[in-house]
């Protein structure tokens, strides 16, 4: 590469910071600039990037903060010596579901920016509402209940929009805004998602929403490829569905569409080329699957404090417990997502109990946990026909399935299909080392059932690869059990892109959009250039004949166990 080759920027506008990451055509990172909202901003009384109103469970961010941040990140890149004139394309990733409310004067302000002044100075008056609801906001229970009931139940809402109603989703948030602040809503000319807000600043006029991020609203009918008219009507109330449709704008199907050239402001202030193209910005989760690139039927498991499971799949099989989005770049594929509240904490509870029993007390070492887990046979079965031990371990209330915090232990006999809630035969805490990891992985396998294909060679349907990210991905014993349960004909891999996944995915999206040949998919172009040895390491085998099938039987018992616990909990209320 000559040092004059094209460059591309991927932005990541998250809850606590804005990051700008620059790559070249070969996907090599050449610059990264960050603006930490708490540390680097001035004039906002935020904490961890947000403001809260606990009385109403509201969590929101001042939109002007993000204006300050964009100038801050670009200043940072300038100080690092970035030659802005080489930047050919820009895309971004935004925290999902958040909404920005533009006033009637927004487009005229965006078009007439003076490059000698900051964005914040000139655009603070461009918004009909100064705040954007954050994904942590929980103020919309009433609205969620209405959304869930409106098409006949949460199943029907998930079938249409990919998800049941959630507090953070944009539709319920707009409904609450329209009722609580009708005058603000009336004066709102356009509504952006956080991702399309970012693209709008760069373009100089309101950018359309992205085909994947629009699926996080409970308003977009995924199969029909259009807004659901009934849900728009519910959301808009007395203002009418047509008015809301105008506020939201059209949604282009091509995730790599060239929306337009960069706003003159950035050409004059930073030295961008006037030919720099702005591409659709997507949501943070869709951007994450672009950082790999994740191929159809590959699975990505984030083993952090909570557990997140992401998969690219050609199958659309929505369920109230899961999320489906359009794939951000590839028509015919969907992004499947599962979010759990319990993850690392539940595993640490068992680890600590084991260390305490063995006398290593306050140690945070995983050595004893790992040793015991690997010595325990799958499902704790002492013999081939013996009972399987399984349980649910939730230190905090769970959403998948929707139950209170607690622990439940069962034995399951696959031969007679009998399930018994009992602690008999459980050697606590030792048996729980394997049981906690199995419980978490069996839930993933249960809910991704039917989304995978056979990788060939007569193998049963399973992911081609399982990628692990987050703190838990460092643990090879957990990776081994994950592979035994989830499969992975090609193995289990640790993925390490630091905390840059969203920004990388956005930057790769820009490279693909500008450099693709006609009809060339993202997976093809990026797959050819991605140097996997820099980012991934194989840490465990995946599919093991016999063991994978045994866990297939365990999934049946696991599903019954969840249903029984849900029934018991419903009876308690």
Curated annotation (Swiss-Prot):
One GO CC term, this protein: cytosol
Matches recorded under Pfam families: FGGY_C, FGGY_N
The EC number(s) this enzyme carries: 2.7.1.17
Reaction(s) the record says it catalyses: D-xylulose + ATP = D-xylulose 5-phosphate + ADP + H(+)
Cross-referenced SUPFAM superfamilies: Actin-like ATPase domain
Broad EC category: transferase
GO MF: ATP binding; D-xylulokinase activity
Residues that, per the record, bind ATP: 366, 471-472, 475
Residue ranges crossing the lipid bilayer per the database entry: none
Induction trigger: By D-xylose, L-arabinose or L-arabitol.
Binding of substrate, residues: 97, 168, 284-285
Record-linked InterPro entries: ATPase_NBD, D-XK_euk, FGGY_C, FGGY_N
Function according to Swiss-Prot or TrEMBL: Highly specific D-xylulose kinase which participates in the catabolism of xylose. Xylose is a major component of hemicelluloses such as xylan. Most fungi utilize D-xylose via three enzymatic reactions, xylose reductase (XR), xylitol dehydrogenase (XDH), and xylulokinase, to form xylulose 5-phosphate, which enters pentose phosphate pathway.
Protein name: Probable D-xylulose kinase A
Gene: xkiA
